Regions:
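Active/ligand-binding-proximal structured segments within catalytic/core domains
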Residues: 76
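Juxtamembrane transmembrane-helix termini
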Residues: 79-88
Length: 213
């Protein structure tokens, strides 16, 4: 790959950073990447380069989208914080105050605080989940609402890597009526002109980078 495939700008003070970025792309270590850095309130680096697909046929663009995985948990928590700010949600109240079906099988006293702090002991599914149904929101939220926690909620930490989205997202939906993706878009992303999605529209797929494992 040529150095010409690295685009954007870099403050001359940070030329070494640009050189490292270019080297990682040119060497093939990164198929494609983007890097933005603010220093003392000023954007000093905004670089992108390489390709956004495994076949290396589509150049990485300034607006290429990437899957940020669990970074989304922080975005969802921001939506929760907005509901708290609006006094529509009290994190010290039981989840079942907002999602009645959740309050069963040992989860009756689980608070929103427990859920947000990954202390709800609901870090997995006790029953096998159907393949190819990950987008079936009602199915998975119902499974979580009905099952018993793995241990007593609120007593220990356990990262809810896969279940947090359904748990927190359903809490938002029960309070507001909108999906977490729509709530974030309407209340946070669009007003702040953020190009961040929770759920992609078909029109965005062409600018979404492949996931390479």
């Amino acid at each position: 790959m040529s150095r010409d495939l690295v685009f954007g700008f870099c403050d001359p003070r940070f030329k070494k950073v640009r050189d490292l970025f270019a080297r990682s792309v040119e060497s093939g270590y990164e198929v494609g990447a983007t890097l933005a850095v603010e220093y003392r309130g000023e954007m000093v680096i905004n670089l992108w380069g390489g390709y956004q697909d495994a076949a290396k046929t589509r150049l990485w663009q300034e607006d290429t989208l990437v899957n940020v995985f669990s970074v989304t948990k922080g975005i969802v928590a921001t939506c929760i914080a907005r509901l708290v700010e609006e006094k529509r949600l009290d994190i010290y109240q039981p989840v079942s105050n907002y999602w009645p079906e959740y309050g069963c099988n040992g989860k009756e006293n689980t608070t929103v605080y427990d859920l947000l702090c990954h202390r709800a002991a609901m870090f997995g599914f006790r029953e096998p989940v159907p393949e190819g149904q990950w987008q079936n929101w009602p199915l998975f939220t119902e499974l979580l609402a009905k099952q018993a926690p793995y241990r007593s909620p609120g007593e220990s930490q356990s990262y809810h890597a896969l279940t947090f989205g359904w748990l927190a997202g359903e809490l938002i939906r029960r309070i507001d009526g909108r999906s977490v993706g729509q709530y974030f878009k309407d209340e946070i992303a669009d007003p702040l002109a953020l190009d961040f999605k929770i759920g992609l529209a078909l029109t965005d797929l062409d600018r979404c980078a492949d996931m390479l494992m």
